[in-house]
């Protein structure tokens, strides 16, 4: 993409304030421990507001009541979001019971939110419950270390219940990569788990004293499923198997979706193929990619700091050669692989180990007891009797994994009685939104609360045009940071202002093409009017098996994005 315009390896200039904050934090300690005891405010002050992100938390407030509280001369109702570190999304039933209890007793909203990063979040943790939540997680073998800010975030792994042996091997690598790239500072253990301060000096041999320039996301992918959306991530290991056994990985680097409205220096980007590596080099290569980005990433501008921008600035071949040098290997040519879809297989699937796996559709990943649909209670009851584990998917759904034939009926009965197996349309199964309002401070428009009724309307359009048995990969994200992964959807809505979105078209079903903006700053009725016409055309004019996104490109409705660094904004 960018060999024509290689730029400097290191960007000179004044460092951002985030770099100062990290340097002065004493390896992420700051004054968080002291701040915990300050009862005058429900939030964290100064640098601690940002430092807690390295410990897996974001400070938020309820935006629905922000103005009302301001009128009453009250500070915003501060509460923390906590995101668990859960490589590959696998969680034991014992762990599930513990998080269910905490969510019900110690959060404002009482819910568990499954995320498209294959983990769960608690929303609405008051300051007094912040230390207890970390201690609860630790008591069941979990933590929230490095699930936010400038680190390698939660490592994703394809939730593939068919190929159980291959999934087991890939999952082990996801865990190994996660552990290898964790920060070494003892700050987390000292602050949250009351572990003794050790006299030795902290060192961060991989991440460095100021950690990474920006967030960094990693996946392990098992083709033909691209459920984890590899092109949204900085570093991707695509599993290559021979005779059902994992032998190595294709490496793809430099994906990412975050943009800024109107800032043409920002762009979504698909990941670049570097080559194939045998298994034994996996950790060395992972470390080499991370340290290259650590040293070459832009620390003068956080909006231009992610790996995708580093690749474009220095050139893919230059970055790749540096990874080879640091890892002491030469990449082999990419091995053949292909993707056929991204969705989860809802319902029962039999694995090759004679165990059954039940994938439950959880709309927007929000687990709560609703009237007539006690989802949270139902999952708790299943957790009490299920001998296998649960797996959170990157589509915000939940797999009850490893169910023996003898237990199927019992688990299905609870799931059905709890509304966990209610029939939904293919369109709803393939739609997703980020959290957005009321808790996300960056939200510009509704997403999670908007999606269910929006999909009701889309379902009506699909029925009107005779394509109810089909689906379009459709996603809503409340702001251009892109947590809802709308910039890899066939139809992506990106929040612009309350009730208004940019409509993007032209992505594809398998998630390998960035969609282009079709209409800007439009309302739901305008979106539906556009989609009514386009779905009608797709229903009539498509070729056999042609997805909606591919159709919009072939029919000339939208120009495909071929090189997003140069043509996304054209």
UniProtKB/Swiss-Prot annotation:
Pathway: Sulfur metabolism; hydrogen sulfide biosynthesis; hydrogen sulfide from sulfite (NADPH route): step 1/1
Superkingdom as given in the UniProt entry: Bacteria
Annotated siroheme binding sites: 483
EC numbers, comma separated: 1.8.1.2
Binding site for [4Fe-4S] cluster: 434, 440, 479, 483
GO cellular component terms, A-Z: sulfite reductase complex (NADPH)
Coiled coil: none
Keywords associated with the record: 4Fe-4S, Amino-acid biosynthesis, Cysteine biosynthesis, Heme, Iron, Iron-sulfur, Metal-binding, NADP, Oxidoreductase
Cofactor: binding details: Binds 1 siroheme per subunit.
Leader sequence segment: none
GO annotation terms (biological process): cysteine biosynthetic process; hydrogen sulfide biosynthetic process; sulfate assimilation
Catalytic activity: hydrogen sulfide + 3 NADP(+) + 3 H2O = sulfite + 3 NADPH + 4 H(+)
Function recorded in the entry: Component of the sulfite reductase complex that catalyzes the 6-electron reduction of sulfite to sulfide. This is one of several activities required for the biosynthesis of L-cysteine from sulfate.
Stored NCBIfam families: CysI, PRK13504.1
Quaternary structure and partners: Alpha(8)-beta(8). The alpha component is a flavoprotein, the beta component is a hemoprotein.
Protein's name according to its UniProt entry: Sulfite reductase [NADPH] hemoprotein beta-component
């Amino acid at each position: 993409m960018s060999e024509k315009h290689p730029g400097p390896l290191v960007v000179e200039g004044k460092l951002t304030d985030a770099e100062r904050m990290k340097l002065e934090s004493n390896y992420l300690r700051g004054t968080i421990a002291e701040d915990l005891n300050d009862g005058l405010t429900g939030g964290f002050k100064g640098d601690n507001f940002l430092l807690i992100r390295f410990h897996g938390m974001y400070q938020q407030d309820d935006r629905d009541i922000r103005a009302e509280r301001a009128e009453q001369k009250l500070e915003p109702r501060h509460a923390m979001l906590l995101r668990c570190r859960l490589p590959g999304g696998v969680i034991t039933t014992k762990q599930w019971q513990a998080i269910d209890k905490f969510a019900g007793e110690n959060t404002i909203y009482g819910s568990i939110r499954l995320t498209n990063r294959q983990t769960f979040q608690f929303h609405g943790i008051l300051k007094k419950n912040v230390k207890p939540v970390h201690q609860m997680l630790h008591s069941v073998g979990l933590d929230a270390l490095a699930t936010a800010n400038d680190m390698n975030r939660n490592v994703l792994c394809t939730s593939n219940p068919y190929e159980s042996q291959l999934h087991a091997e890939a999952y082990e690598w996801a865990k190994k990569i996660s552990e290898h790239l964790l920060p070494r500072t003892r700050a987390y253990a000292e602050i949250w788990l009351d572990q003794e301060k050790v006299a030795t000096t902290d060192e961060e041999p991989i991440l460095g004293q100021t950690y990474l320039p920006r967030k960094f996301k990693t996946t392990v992918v098992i083709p033909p499923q691209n459920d984890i959306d590899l092109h949204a991530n900085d570093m991707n290991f695509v599993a290559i198997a021979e005779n059902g056994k994992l032998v190595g990985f294709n490496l793809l680097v430099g994906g990412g979706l975050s943009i800024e409205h109107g800032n043409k220096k920002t762009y979504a980007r698909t990941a670049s193929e570097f080559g194939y590596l045998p298994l034994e080099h996996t950790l060395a290569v992972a470390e080499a990619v991370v340290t290259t980005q650590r040293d070459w990433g832009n620390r003068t501008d956080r909006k231009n700091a992610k790996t995708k921008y580093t690749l474009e600035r220095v050139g893919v071949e230059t970055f790749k050669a540096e990874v080879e040098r640091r890892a002491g290997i030469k990449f082999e040519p990419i091995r053949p692989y292909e993707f056929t879809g991204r969705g989860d297989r809802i319902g029962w699937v039999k694995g090759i180990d004679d165990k059954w796996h039940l994938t439950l559709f959880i709309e927007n990943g929000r687990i709560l007891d609703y009237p007539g649909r006690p989802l949270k209670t139902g999952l708790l009851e299943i957790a009490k009797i299920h001998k296998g584990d649960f797996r959170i998917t990157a589509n915000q759904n939940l797999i009850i994994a490893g169910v023996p034939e003898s237990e199927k009926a019992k688990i299905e009965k609870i799931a059905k009685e709890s509304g966990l197996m209610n029939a939904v349309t293919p369109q709803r199964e393939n739609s997703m939104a980020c959290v957005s309002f009321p808790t996300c401070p960056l939200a510009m428009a509704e997403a999670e609360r908007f999606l269910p009724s929006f999909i009701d309307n889309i379902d009506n359009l699909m029925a009107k045009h005779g394509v109810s048995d089909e689906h379009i990969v459709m996603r809503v994200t409340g702001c251009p940071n892109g947590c809802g992964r709308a910039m890899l959807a066939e139809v992506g809505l990106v929040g612009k202002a309350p009730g208004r979105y940019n409509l993007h078209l032209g992505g594809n079903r398998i998630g390998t093409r960035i969609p282009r903006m079709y209409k800007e700053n439009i309302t739901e009725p305008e979106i539906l009017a556009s989609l009514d016409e386009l779905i009608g055309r797709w229903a009539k004019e498509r070729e056999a098996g042609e997805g909606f996104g591919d159709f919009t490109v072939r029919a000339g409705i939208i120009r495909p994005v071929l090189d997003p660094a140069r043509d996304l904004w054209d």
